[in-house]
């Protein structure tokens, strides 16, 4: 990672309490980004090279979409789902050890060595505006955002709607937060009001130290894009968060691949592995790994490949 990019992560305590103001001209930011994408081994002709699985399927993509959206009933659970509403008082004291609070889907508040990190924050609808009616939350979570403490860092795995939410980014845009995103993802944040000075873009295996902890951007096997026209224009990633005593792995979205073993070799030992498992598309016959996800047995194998202590 270039020196100019790294410098933006080393903020003083005084700077962390000030409202962000951009010091990097937009043209400079975009020029730096274009340069890094051009020389990144993950990109080719401005797009991320995609090597997802291609498992034979008895149904086409569109057949699965139709049967999944139209044939699976009910889309909402028949029974009440147990949940515990967030209370502001539970975060009154910072946790010096590793503490995780799962907030739904891939959103977690990670507390390590007194630092708070929010992963893939999504609190409203995990879908484009036009599809909100199909993808309402079974348990509303919007108010959780207001109850949480402001994190020092927000980590993004990729730019799909269920991992990168415009309304939540706008909520944090004027807060003293540093955003860590895979290469190319910062353009979305700038559009939603985040200052370029508060965005750090990572290629795979880039790392940074922040107040005694280390964050490493690690590979994943997925895809990216928020429209048909920007498919794979930004990088996707997983993340390793190393504290003084414990190390956490956050997978984001990923199909099963050899990168889990490589991450264990280069970043281990890993204490806690937070791994995705795809929704069970019962009877639909389409392998979720072709969409860049893991079935349950893949998740278990990834856990073993990581040689992690807890899942």
Specify the residue positions occupied by each region the protein language model found.
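Metallo-beta-lactamase
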Residues: 1-145, 181-252, 271-272, 277-278
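Cap/insert and terminal regions of metallo-dependent hydrolase folds
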Residues: 23-24, 39, 43-46, 50, ...
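Catalytic core of the metallo-beta-lactamase
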Residues: 107-113, 209-270, 290, 294
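Divalent metal-coordination and catalytic microenvironments
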Residues: 110, 120, 158, 179, ...
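Acidic/histidine-rich helix-loop elements
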Residues: 123-140, 223-230, 282-293
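Active-site metal-binding motif and surrounding structural segment of the metallo-beta-lactamase
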Residues: 131-180, 268-274
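Catalytic metal-binding/acid-base residues of hydrolase active sites
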Residues: 160, 205, 221, 255, ...
């Amino acid at each position: 990672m270039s020196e100019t990019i790294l410098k933006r992560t080393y903020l003083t305590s005084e700077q962390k309490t000030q409202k962000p103001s951009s010091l990097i001209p937009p043209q400079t930011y975009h020029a730096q980004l274009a340069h890094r994408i051009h020389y990144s081994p993950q990109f080719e002709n401005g797009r991320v090279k995609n090597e997802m699985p291609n498992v034979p399927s008895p149904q086409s993509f569109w057949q699965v979409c139709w049967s999944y959206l139209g044939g699976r009933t009910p889309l909402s659970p028949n029974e009440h789902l147990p949940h515990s509403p967030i209370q502001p008082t539970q975060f009154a004291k910072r946790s010096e050890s590793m503490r995780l609070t799962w907030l739904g889907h891939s959103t977690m508040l990670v507390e390590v060595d007194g630092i708070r990190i929010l992963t893939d924050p999504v609190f409203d609808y995990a879908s484009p505006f036009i599809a909100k009616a199909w993808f309402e939350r079974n348990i509303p979570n919007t108010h959780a955002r207001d109850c949480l403490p402001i994190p020092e860092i927000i980590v993004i795995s990729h730019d799909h709607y269920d991992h990168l939410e415009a309304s939540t980014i706008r909520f944090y845009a004027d807060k003293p937060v540093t955003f860590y995103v895979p290469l190319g993802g910062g353009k979305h944040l700038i559009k939603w009001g985040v200052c370029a000075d508060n965005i750090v873009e990572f290629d795979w295996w880039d790392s940074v130290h922040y107040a005694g902890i280390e964050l490493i951007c690690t590979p994943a096997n997925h895809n990216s894009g928020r429209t048909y026209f920007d498919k794979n224009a930004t990088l996707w990633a997983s993340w390793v968060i190393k504290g003084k005593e414990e190390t956490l792995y956050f997978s984001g979205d990923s199909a099963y691949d050899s990168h889990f073993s490589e991450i264990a070799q280069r970043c281990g030992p890993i204490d806690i592995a937070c791994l995705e498992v795809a929704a069970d598309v019962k009877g639909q016959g389409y392998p979720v790994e072709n969409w860049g996800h893991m079935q349950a047995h893949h998740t278990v194998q990834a856990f073993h490949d990581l040689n992690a202590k807890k899942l």
